[in-house]
From Swiss-Prot:
Regulatory subunit of serine/threonine-protein phosphatase 4. Pfam families: EVH1_PP4R3, PP4R3. The gene is smek1. One of its GO terms (molecular function) is protein phosphatase activator activity. This is Serine/threonine-protein phosphatase 4 regulatory subunit 3.
Length: 818
C-alpha cells in the first residue's frame, strides 16, 4: 500500500543517543521466507529500495509513542523507530505487531526483556496484576515504597505503568500534591517527589503524555521542587512563570504549534534543570524522554517551515528599516533558535530547511543585520551565519559572487564579516576566532564544487583576491611599515596572528592567486617584520608563514626571497634570540635545516654568500656548517665540471642498458679491427677500473687530492710524460681527466657539452688537436677514458640532461656565485 497512511520515516539511535534518519518510505507487513516469520518492510519512496526488513520477534518489546511512533530494540545497542505521517497507519501496523505477539492492541508496550530469576518470573506471572494503594495522604509512603521496589524488575515496572495509566493515578497524585502544598505537609511532599521521579524512570510514553499535558506539567514540576536531600525547595515554577516569558515575535496562528513550543521548552527544562543527573544505572531509563523532546523539535521545525506566511513576515520585519532595535533583537534571537532546532534534523531534511531559508532571503537579511551597530544583534547574526557556512558553504559563496556585481566592496557580506573580525572588542578575540574559522571554510578548495560548466574554485578565488583580500590584509600592512610592528599590544598581535594563519592556509591550498598577491604586494617582507614582536606567538606565526613558502620549493618564491634579501630579518631574529633554547630558536634552525636537507641550491648559495659571517660561529648544531659544505660542493662542481661528467659517464655505463646502447656497442664491435682484439686490447676495461676507483674514493676527497697535485700533473701531461700504449685507430678519440687544463684531444665543441663522455673539460679550456690515439694512461690515480664518435654523437644530449640533474647549468651557477 503506498497511500499516506503507511508513509513513514525510519530512524536508528546512534552512539550519542541521537536519532539518525535512514530515509522515508512506505511500510507494510508480510511473511518473509528467509526470516521465517512475519516482518516489517519499508521501501524507499524515491527508488523502491528496501530501507528496513525486520522480523516481528515474539520476544521483542515494541512501544507505541505519541500515537504516531513505534520504537523497539533489535539488538543490545540497536534501537529502531518508525515515525508515521498519520495515526491510522500507525494503528494498523501496531495491530499487526500485537497480533503476532498475541497482545491486546490497546497496550502501548508489548513486553520487556526479562533478566530475573525463574522463581521471580513465576511469582510475577502468577499474580494477576499490581494493585495500587488508595491515593490518600496517609498512604503516600506506601505508594513511594511500591514504586521504588518495582523499578528493578521489568515485569513489575510494566504492571505498575499499566496500573498508573488505567486508574488515572497520576492526576490523583497531583491533586494530593496541591493539598500537601496548601497544608505545608513537608513529609508528604518528599514522598511525592520520590513517586514522580520513579514514574519518570518507568520510561513510558503514555505516562509522559499525561504528565506533560497543559493542565498537569506545572504540578509535576512542583512535585520535583521538594527534593528531600535539599534543605529548601527549588523555585522552578516561579522561574517558568515569571522569569522565562514566551515572546511571540511573529504571531503564531496555529494553536497546536504554540502548545507544542510551550511543551517542548518545559520538558527540556525538566530534563536539563529539574531532574537530578541520572546515575550510570538510570541513564538508559530516560531514553524515551530524550526521544519525546527530539521528535517534538522535528515537528516544530517542520510546522514552521511549512508556514510560508510566518517566514515571509519574519524576514520582512528583519530587513525593514522601520523595525525598532528591541524588536529586531528578538527577531534575530528567534531565527538563531530556529536554526539551532534544525540541528536535530537529518541531512536531507536539513538541506531542505536551509534551502527554504535561502529562498526567503536569509543571506540578504544577515547582510543588513551585520551592518548594524548593536553588538548583541551582530553576535546572533554571526551564529546564524556560522550555521549556514558549516552546512552549505557553496550557497554562501554563490550569493557573495552574485552580489559583487551589484554592490561596492565595502558592503559585501564577506567584507562585513572581515571587518567585524578586525573590530572585535573582546580582549581574547573570541568572536574573531569564530569568524576566521568561517572564512577558512569559505576559502577552502576542498569543499568547493566542480561542474562541467564552471569551476567554483577558480571563480570564487578570483573574486576573493580581487574584492576581499585587501580588506583582510589591511591591518597587517598598516602595522608593518617600519622595521618593527607599529602596535605591539596583545590584542593587536592576536589579530595579526589570526590574519597570518589564514594567509599561511592560503599559501598551502591556493596556487597562483596567493603567489601573485604575495609577490606583488611584498607580503612576505611585511610579515617578517612581525619577527621583531615582543610576543613570541606572533613571531612564530611569521616564521611558519615563511617556512610554508620555502617548503613549496617554488623558484618564483625563491627568487623573490633572494632579490629582496628576506632571510635578513630571520637571521636577525635568530641572532637576537641569542643562546636561548626556545621555540623561535628551533623554528629558525629547522627552516635552515630544510634548505640543507632538500638541497635548495639557490637559497643555499644566497644564505652562505650573504649571512655566513653571522652564522659561522653557531656550532651547537651542524646545520650551518652543513649548508657551507653544500655551498662548497656546488662551487666545486662549477669549478670542476669533470665531476659531473664522470658521474654521468658512470651512471651511463653502470645503469643504462637500453636498446640504443646495445646498438652502439655492436656498431663499435664491427668498426674495430680484428688486430685490436687479437692484441688483447680491452674495449671498456678502463671504465671498469674507474668504477672501482669511484667506489673506493669519495669524489670530494679525490678532487681535493687533484687540486694539491695540480701543478706537478700539469707539467707531466704538458711535457708528454704520459705514456701511450696500444695501437691507434682513426675511429677512437683519447681524453684525459687529469686536470682542467690537461684535455689534449677534446673536440672543439666540448666546451658546449661539459657532460658528454668524450669531453670532460672545463669552460674556457682551449681544445687542442692531437693525433688520434686509443691508448689510456693512469698516473697519480687518474684514469683516461675511451669513447667513440658514435656514442658521442648519439648520446651527447642525453648525458647532458643527466649532468643537469646533478647540478644547474654552468651559466646559472656562475650567476649565483657572483
Amino acid at each position: 500500500m503506498t497511500d499516506t497512511r503507511r508513509r513513514v520515516k525510519v530512524y536508528t539511535l546512534n552512539e550519542d543517543r541521537q536519532w539518525d534518519d535512514r530515509g522515508t518510505g512506505h511500510v507494510s507487513s508480510a511473511y518473509v521466507e528467509r526470516l521465517k516469520g512475519m516482518s516489517l518492510l519499508v521501501r524507499a519512496e524515491s527508488d523502491g529500495s528496501l530501507l528496513l526488513e525486520s522480523k516481528i520477534n515474539p520476544n521483542t518489546a515494541y512501544q507505541k509513542q505519541q500515537d504516531t511512533l513505534i520504537v523497539w530494540s533489535e539488538a543490545e545497542n540497536y534501537d529502531l523507530a518508525l515515525s508515521f505521517q498519520e495515526k491510522a497507519g500507525c494503528d494498523e501496523i501496531w495491530e499487526k505487531i500485537c497480533q503476532v505477539q498475541g497482545k491486546d492492541p490497546s497496550v502501548d508496550i508489548t513486553q520487556e526483556l526479562i533478566d530475573e530469576s525463574e522463581e521471580e518470573r513465576f511469582d510475577d506471572m502468577s499474580s494477576p496484576g499490581l494493585e495500587l494503594p488508595p491515593c490518600e495522604l496517609s498512604r503516600l509512603e506506601e505508594v513511594a515504597e511500591l514504586v521504588a521496589s518495582s523499578l528493578p524488575s521489568p515485569l513489575r515496572r510494566e504492571k505498575l505503568a499499566l496500573a498508573l495509566e488505567n486508574e488515572g493515578y497520576i492526576r490523583k497524585l497531583l491533586e494530593l500534591f496541591r493539598v500537601c502544598e496548601d497544608l505545608e505537609n513537608r513529609e508528604g511532599l518528599h514522598h511525592l517527589y520520590d513517586i514522580i521521579k520513579g514514574i519518570f524512570l518507568l520510561n513510558r510514553t503514555a505516562l509522559f503524555e499525561v504528565m506533560f499535558s497543559e493542565e498537569c506539567i506545572m504540578d509535576v514540576i512542583g512535585c520535583l521542587e521538594f527534593d528531600p536531600s535539599l534543605p529548601q525547595p527549588r523555585r522552578h515554577r516561579e522561574f517558568l512563570t515569571t522569569t522565562a516569558r514566551f515572546k511571540e515575535v511573529i504571531p503564531i496562528s496555529d494553536p497546536e504549534l504554540r502548545q507544542k513550543i510551550h511543551q517542548t521548552y518545559r520538558v527540556q527544562y525538566i530534563q536539563d534543570m529539574v531532574l537530578p543527573t541520572p546515575s550510570v544505572f538510570e541513564e538508559n531509563m530516560l531514553s524515551t524522554l530524550h526521544s519525546f523532546i527530539f521528535f517534538n523539535k522535528v515537528e516544530i521545525v517542520g510546522m514552521l517551515q511549512d508556514d510560508e506566511k510566518f517566514l515571509t513576515e519574519l524576514f520582512a520585519q528583519l530587513t525593514d528599516e522601520a523595525t525598532d532595535d528591541d524588536k529586531r533583537h528578538e527577531l534575530v534571537n528567534f531565527l538563531k533558535e530556529f536554526c539551532a532546532f534544525s540541528q536535530t534534523l537529518q541531512p536531507q531534511n536539513r538541506d531542505a530547511f536551509f534551502k527554504t531559508l535561502s529562498n526567503m532571503g536569509i543571506l540578504q537579511a544577515l547582510e543588513v543585520i551585520l551592518g548594524m551597530d548593536d553588538v548583541q544583534v551582530r553576535g546572533a547574526a554571526t551564529d546564524i551565519f556560522s550555521y549556514l557556512v558549516e552546512y552549505n558553504p557553496s550557497m554562501v559563496r554563490e550569493f557573495v559572487m552574485q552580489e559583487s556585481q551589484q554592490n561596492d566592496d565595502d558592503i559585501l557580506l564577506i567584507n562585513l564579516i572581515i571587518e567585524h573580525m578586525i573590530c572585535d572588542t573582546d580582549p581574547e578575540l573570541g568572536g574573531a576566532v569564530q569568524l576566521m574559522g568561517l572564512l577558512r571554510t569559505l576559502v577552502d578548495p576542498e569543499n568547493m564544487l566542480a561542474t562541467a560548466n564552471k569551476t567554483e574554485k577558480t571563480e570564487f578565488l578570483s573574486f576573493f583576491y580581487k574584492h576581499c583580500m585587501h580588506v583582510l590584509s589591511a591591518p597587517l600592512l598598516a602595522n608593518t611599515t617600519e622595521e618593527k610592528p607599529s602596535k605591539d599590544d596583545f590584542q593587536t598581535c592576536q589579530l595579526l596572528a589570526l590574519i597570518v594563519e589564514l594567509l599561511t592556509f592560503c599559501v598551502e591550498h591556493h596556487t597562483y592567486h596567493i603567489k601573485n598577491y604575495i609577490i606583488n604586494k611584498d607580503i612576505l617582507r611585511r610579515v617578517l617584520v612581525l619577527t621583531a614582536s615582543q610576543h613570541a606567538f606572533l613571531a612564530l606565526c611569521a616564521l611558519r608563514f615563511m617556512r610554508k613558502i620555502i617548503g613549496l620549493k617554488d623558484e618564483f618564491y625563491n627568487r623573490y626571497i633572494m632579490r629582496n634579501f628576506l632571510f635578513e630579518p630571520v637571521v636577525k631574529a635568530f641572532l637576537n634570540n641569542g643562546s636561548r633554547y626556545n621555540l623561535i630558536n628551533s623554528a629558525i634552525i629547522e627552516m635552515f635545516e630544510y634548505v640543507r636537507v632538500e638541497d635548495v641550491k639557490s637559497l643555499t648559495a644566497h644564505i652562505i654568500e650573504n649571512y655566513w659571517k653571522g652564522l659561522e660561529d653557531v656550532d651547537y648544531v651542524q646545520t650551518f656548517k652543513g649548508l657551507k659544505l653544500r655551498y662548497e660542493q656546488q662551487r666545486e662542481r662549477q669549478d670542476n665540471p669533470k665531476l659531473d661528467s664522470m658521474r654521468s659517464i658512470l651512471r651511463n655505463h653502470r645503469f643504462r642498458r637500453d636498446a640504443r646502447t646495445l646498438e652502439d656497442e655492436e656498431e663499435m664491435w664491427f668498426n674495430t679491427d680484428e688486430e685490436d682484439l687479437e692484441d688483447g686490447e680491452a674495449v671498456v676495461p678502463p671504465s671498469d677500473k674507474m668504477k672501482n676507483d669511484e667506489d673506493l674514493m669519495d669524489p670530494i676527497s679525490k678532487f681535493m687530492e687533484r687540486k694539491k697535485l695540480k701543478d706537478s700533473e700539469e707539467k707531466e701531461v704538458l711535457t708528454g710524460k704520459a705514456s701511450l700504449s696500444g695501437r691507434q685507430s682513426p675511429s677512437f678519440k683519447l681524453s684525459f681527466s687529469s686536470s682542467p687544463k690537461a684535455s689534449l684531444s677534446s673536440p672543439p665543441t666540448a666546451s658546449l657539452h661539459p657532460g658528454s663522455p668524450g669531453s670532460p673539460s672545463s669552460p674556457g679550456t682551449g681544445a687542442r688537436s692531437s693525433p688520434p690515439s686509443a691508448a689510456v694512461t693512469t698516473k697519480g690515480g687518474l684514469v683516461g677514458l675511451v669513447d667513440y664518435p658514435d656514442d658521442d654523437e648519439e648520446d651527447e644530449d642525453e648525458e647532458d640532461a643527466d649532468s643537469k640533474e646533478e647540478s644547474p647549468p654552468l651559466s646559472k651557477k656562475s650567476k649565483l656565485s657572483s
